[in-house]
Swiss-Prot record:
Biological-process GO terms, alphabetical: negative regulation of transcription by RNA polymerase II; positive regulation of transcription elongation by RNA polymerase II; positive regulation of transcription initiation by RNA polymerase II; RNA polymerase II preinitiation complex assembly
Assembly and oligomerization: Component of the Mediator complex.
Name recorded for this polypeptide: Mediator of RNA polymerase II transcription subunit 7
GO terms assigned for molecular function: transcription coactivator activity
Source organism (scientific name): Debaryomyces hansenii (strain ATCC 36239 / CBS 767 / BCRC 21394 / JCM 1990 / NBRC 0083 / IGC 2968)
SUPFAM superfamilies, per the entry: Mediator hinge subcomplex-like (SSF140718)
Length: 244
């Protein structure tokens, strides 16, 4: 029954805590009034008052105590959603997790070359234990679970060493993502520059064509004006000749 309850706690998203209903505008105003009153009575500044609150030496009365954030637990772990969580975000060691560590070096001191050597050793041990498992099953099948546990321990050690590469993998993934974004931005900039140059060239062609057309129109106008002047002169000359 206890195991079933723990599974339910771990699997289901819990409802909000019952004290969420105390977070009202009126209670928030009352909390500010209480802080100011406590500050005046104790003759301390606001920083000291907050420090006193963190030390849990004084608490607001009634419902107001739920509005003050709780103090961080003194332990290294806390329970949330049915599981234990560590305050320090780091990969727990095999010994801390209750498993036997098959290599000697510490996770924080082990070098990359040593990790590679240890992985090769563990892979050799994994293959050897698998062959031993086949031999045990062929001779005494009831003893197979011992070798299964050995294989499980080796695989857990391999998985733990691989997990130590997670920070490096995260950095490399971030670098690849940033490089990809930079390349995309550069391609976009080059496309914009190319489009801008095409538009500029088209505008220049339009301007040149319009200028040439204006020049031709002006030339035609000049030619027609000259023809009209010559016709007028010819008519005037004929009239003068007739009068003579």
């Amino acid at each position: 029954m206890t195991s079933t309850n723990e599974d339910i706690i771990s699997s289901l998203y819990p409802p909000p805590p019952p004290y969420f209903k105390y977070f009202t505008e009126q209670n928030l105003n009352n909390l500010e009034i209480w802080k100011n009153k406590a500050q005046d009575e104790m003759q301390i500044d606001k920083t000291d008052l907050e420090q006193v609150k963190e030390d849990q030496d004084i608490k607001p009365p009634g419902e107001l105590k739920f509005l003050v954030p709780p103090k961080q637990p003194d332990a290294d772990h806390y329970r949330g959603f049915g599981n234990l969580w560590s305050f320090e975000d780091k990969l727990p060691g095999l010994k801390e997790s209750g498993w036997t560590q098959l290599y000697k070096d510490d996770d924080e001191l082990i070098t990359s070359n040593t990790k590679i050597d240890e992985l090769h050793k563990l892979m050799d041990s994994l293959l050897l234990n698998f062959l031993e498992l086949i031999g045990v099953v062929s001779i005494d099948p009831q003893q197979f679970h011992y070798k299964i546990e050995d294989l499980k321990l080796i695989l857990i050690n391999i998985n733990h060493i691989l997990n130590t590469y997670r920070p490096h993998q995260s950095r490399e993934s971030l670098i690849m993502l940033l490089r990809k974004q930079i390349d995309m931005k550069r391609n976009e900039i080059s496309e914009i520059d190319k489009t801008s140059e095409d538009i500029k060239s088209k505008i220049l062609k339009l301007v040149d064509t319009s200028y040439i057309g204006d020049q031709e129109d002006a030339k035609c106008d000049n030619d027609s004006t000259e023809d009209e002047e010559s016709i007028k002169n010819n008519i005037i000359q004929k009239l003068l000749n007739q009068n003579v």
